[in-house]
From Swiss-Prot:
Domain of life: Archaea
GO cellular component entries: cytoplasmic side of plasma membrane; cytosol
Homology family: Belongs to the ParA family. MinD subfamily.
Name of this chain's protein: Uncharacterized ATP-binding protein MJ0547
């Protein structure tokens, strides 16, 4: 069991579309639900969207302002769901152009001092911001989809992380639909040579929650994906948690047949 306290965790992926930001946001809220003081920072200063998932879009001061030397980090911290401290990157192209990514390491250290757990939502791929975030973090979680192209891209992230000397916590396999073409957990662990610390199923509730700007674990806490994320959060801090999935409602026809013939 992985147990993490007072740590900065970089969450990265080899390519876009894995659901990395959704995992970052909801994992932060899930950890807060367990009573931890948590912050989540959007290090994807070019393609920021963490603020949309956390319901904090349009904030006047963002990480890009801080990286441009136009604001202090304390002014770019906002309280989000479950008391999670959120540092949005902002969506302004003008502010992005002024931002200096090399200041990110300094910012991360300042935020880390305020909380028990800092979640860093890295940009997809292996760009400058990702490398800075990973090197500044205590541990890495790589988010993958159960397909060979996603796993192949994740190998690059893992190799660079090892070279940077940052610990690798493990992988989260996201958007699993159990199709025959998908790679299984054992195969993924064999290829990546890191443990899979959680499997999050494909779940229509994820898009619904995002559309309302509310984290999944708050809006649909009983959904399969939310329960999987809560289990991952519990594993990270060494807490006990049992998934409480609602049973599907029995159809009218099923009830009718049982009533007609009885259970055998």
């Amino acid at each position: 069991m992985v147990t993490l306290m007072a740590i900065a965790i970089a969450i990265a992926s080899g390519k876009g579309g894995t659901g990395k930001t959704t995992i970052s946001a909801n994992l932060a809220v899930a950890l807060a639900k367990f009573g931890k003081k948590v912050a989540v920072l959007d290090a994807d200063i070019a393609m920021a969207n963490l603020e949309l998932i956390m319901g904090l879009e349009g904030k006047p001061v963002t990480l890009n302002d801080v990286l441009a030397g136009k604001a202090d980090i304390k002014d770019a911290i906002y309280e989000g769901p479950e008391g999670v401290l959120v540092i949005p990157a902002g969506v302004s192209l003008e502010k992005f152009r002024r931002a200096k990514p090399e200041k990110l390491e300094e910012v991360l250290k300042a935020i880390h001092d305020l909380v028990e757990i800092l979640i860093i939502d890295c940009p997809a791929g292996i760009g400058k911001e990702t490398l800075i975030a990973i090197s500044s973090a205590d541990g890495l979680i790589v988010v993958v989809n159960p397909e060979i192209s996603s796993i192949s891209d994740a190998l690059k992230i893992i190799a660079i992380t090892k070279r940077l000397g940052t610990d690798i916590i493990g992988a989260i396999v996201n958007r699993v639909s159990n199709e025959s073409t998908e790679l299984g957990v054992k195969a993924i662990e064999t290829i990546l040579e890191v443990p899979v610390i959680g499997v999050v199923p494909e779940d229509p509730h994820v898009r619904k929650a995002a559309a309302f700007g509310t984290p999944l674990v708050i809006m649909y806490p009983d959904s399969p994906a939310a329960q999987a994320i809560m289990e991952i959060a519990a594993k990270l801090i060494g807490a006990k948690y049992e998934a409480q999935l609602k049973k599907k409602k029995e159809s009218f026809i099923s009830k009718f047949i049982k009533g007609l013939f009885g259970r055998r």
